[in-house]
Regions:
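Anion-recognition interface
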Residues: 1-206
């Protein structure tokens, strides 16, 4: 069972993970050279290699989108398609969510703090990503309802449209792009959030 996420959303998710791990690159500079020639993002190219190795009948491709997952839960969805003999109701699903995507405000704060710390080296920096994750998660005044805004998303969706159509035709039997198109965002990705970063200078220089 293999899950595929629309490429521009995948890039945004990787950006969020990178920030949580201490990365400080700006959103506009993050993976700005990705194109259908990139193996990691071209699902038609990469999945053909899986087909060559295991055979097409052994593959179960799925779209990674909560609205398309069984009961909106990837665990249940995986069980349904990989282990249908397992009763999903016999399992416990109480677990704390991990590595949640950052909101737009959170990402801006992470990027500012991480870039300010960028030149620090040595063991003293090893614990900082974890500390920052805790501090930002507890910080009041952040708007956590708005996802990271990347105005490049529609262009990336369009760039991969042809290869995605071919991918879905071959592996889903549908001659269309089944990925939901991202909306054009109105917010400048580098726009300062509602709070001032200077209000949290203690995070940037501590």
């Amino acid at each position: 069972v293999c899950y595929f996420r629309e490429q521009s959303r995948k890039r945004t998710s990787l950006y969020s993970t990178g920030l949580r791990s201490g990365g400080g690159v700006s959103l506009q500079d993050f993976q700005k050279d990705k194109s259908p020639e990139n193996h990691h993002y071209n699902y038609l190219t990469s999945f053909r290699k899986w087909e060559d190795a295991f055979g097409i009948d052994a593959l179960v491709p799925r779209i990674y989108d909560r609205d398309r997952l069984d009961e909106g839960d990837i665990r249940r969805d995986f069980l349904k398609h990989a282990l249908p003999e397992v009763d999903p109701e016999a399992l416990a699903y109480a677990a704390q969510e991990a590595n949640m995507s950052l909101s737009h405000d959170e990402a801006r704060l992470f990027q500012a703090v991480n870039s300010a710390r960028g030149k620090r080296i040595g063991r003293v920096q090893d614990h900082l990503p974890g500390v920052l994750n805790k501090l930002v998660s507890d910080l009041p005044g952040l708007d956590r309802s708005v996802e990271i805004n990347d105005p490049r998303q529609p262009d990336m969706y369009a760039a991969f449209d042809a290869s995605n159509r071919a991918f879905f035709k071959r592996y889903f039997g549908q001659d269309t792009n089944l990925f939901t198109a991202p909306k054009q965002v109105a917010t400048d990705p580098e726009e300062t959030p509602k709070y001032r970063l200077s209000d949290h200078a203690d995070l940037m220089h501590s």
